[in-house]
């Protein structure tokens, strides 16, 4: 009799086990660049419980920008948060990936030069620090300069690397200016007496600078999972955009980005009220994506200027309900 009861209890336990496990959070792996103010959207979504509310356990794998989309294509992550250009270029070359949401909106960078330079026109005949020929920062700078009537032949680009290297090149006098600076290096430059020659936000009104990508295969298998992810991201952006959360957002930047409170406060003001870098709250910006496609086609980084809708999963179109 005891044996029958024991087996009955065991059978009941095995029957209930899958039911209890089904209530566990769905695990999602996300590739992203090393955390800066640009990545605060998914940091907030995790820290403030928005992923948890959507029953998601999101593991973030940080890597260099050029590897983020490659990890998605290789199938080692579920979602990539990447510069839109990396994903668009890959998709244009045949990668089976689609955009499912927006991350950074606009282009929160500045052109910063040494004190003797007062405007972009003053950069004619000068050396300007850039990241690389293939960098989207180079593409955007050349486009803005061309629209100002200053062709690439009028200045020399010296490719030195990322923001720290560009900052140092300007500080040493090796170059006249850096073609793109963002927090905290723009603040450090201004404090040192250097001049802001351009706020890109004055020139570029719509740009889907970064976005979230997923593979076509994964989307077909579990589109609702990605819908929950984007919804949580949107809630995170809504939280960071709320002025009532300014102090808490600054504290989160201090903790997670390992920066001091003064820089964090400057960064918050620059990214949120001034540049509204998360204004789309996860929704794909069609006009901003079209602008990115235009930039890439104009610089021969993609062969064809296709409609922006081509690159977005149908369920995540701005008008999709």
Regions found by a protein language model. Give the residues of each.
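Pocket-lining segment of extracytoplasmic ligand-binding domains
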Residues: 86, 158, 165-257
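Short amphipathic alpha-helical segments at helix boundaries and their inter-helical linkers
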Residues: 77-82, 171-172, 270-286, 318-321
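Bacterial N-terminal signal peptides
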Residues: 8-18
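Secondary-structure end/capping motifs
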Residues: 220-302
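Sec/Tat signal peptide C-region and signal peptidase I cleavage site
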Residues: 19-24
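Conserved C-terminal helix/tail region of periplasmic/extracytoplasmic solute-binding proteins
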Residues: 290-321
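Bacterial N-terminal signal peptides that target proteins for export
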Residues: 1-9
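Short, glycine-/small- and polar/acidic-enriched structural segments
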Residues: 26-162, 166-172, 176-183, 196-202, ...
């Amino acid at each position: 009799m005891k044996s029958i009861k024991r087996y009955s209890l065991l059978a009941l336990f095995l029957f209930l086990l899958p039911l209890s496990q089904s209530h566990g959070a769905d695990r999602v792996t996300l590739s992203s660049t090393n955390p800066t103010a640009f990545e605060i959207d998914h940091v907030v979504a995790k820290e403030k419980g928005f992923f948890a509310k959507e029953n998601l356990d999101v593991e973030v794998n940080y890597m260099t920008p050029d590897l983020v989309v490659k990890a998605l294509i290789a199938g080692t992550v579920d979602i990539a948060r990447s510069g839109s250009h990396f994903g668009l270029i890959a998709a244009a070359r045949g990668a089976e990936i689609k955009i499912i949401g927006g991350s950074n909106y606009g282009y929160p960078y500045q052109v910063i030069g040494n004190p003797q330079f007062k405007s972009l026109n003053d950069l004619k005949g000068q050396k300007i620090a850039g990241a690389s020929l293939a960098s989207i920062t180079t593409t955007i700078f050349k486009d803005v300069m061309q629209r100002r009537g200053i062709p690439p032949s009028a200045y020399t680009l010296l490719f030195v690397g990322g923001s720290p290297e560009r900052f140092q090149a300007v500080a040493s006098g090796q170059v006249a200016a850096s073609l793109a600076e963002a927090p905290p290096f723009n603040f450090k430059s201004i404090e040192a007496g250097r001049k802001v020659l351009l706020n890109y936000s004055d020139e570029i009104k719509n740009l889907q600078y970064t976005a979230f990508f997923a593979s076509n295969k994964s989307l077909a298998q579990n589109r609702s999972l990605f819908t929950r992810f984007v919804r949580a991201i949107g809630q995170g952006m809504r939280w960071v955009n709320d002025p009532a959360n300014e102090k808490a957002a600054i504290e989160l930047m201090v903790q997670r980005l390992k920066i001091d409170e003064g820089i964090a406060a400057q960064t918050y003001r620059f990214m949120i009220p001034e540049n509204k870098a998360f204004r789309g709250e996860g929704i794909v910006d069609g006009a901003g994506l079209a602008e990115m496609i235009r930039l890439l086609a104009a610089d021969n980084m993609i062969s064809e200027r296709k409609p922006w809708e081509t690159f977005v999963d149908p369920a995540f179109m701005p008008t999709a309900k």
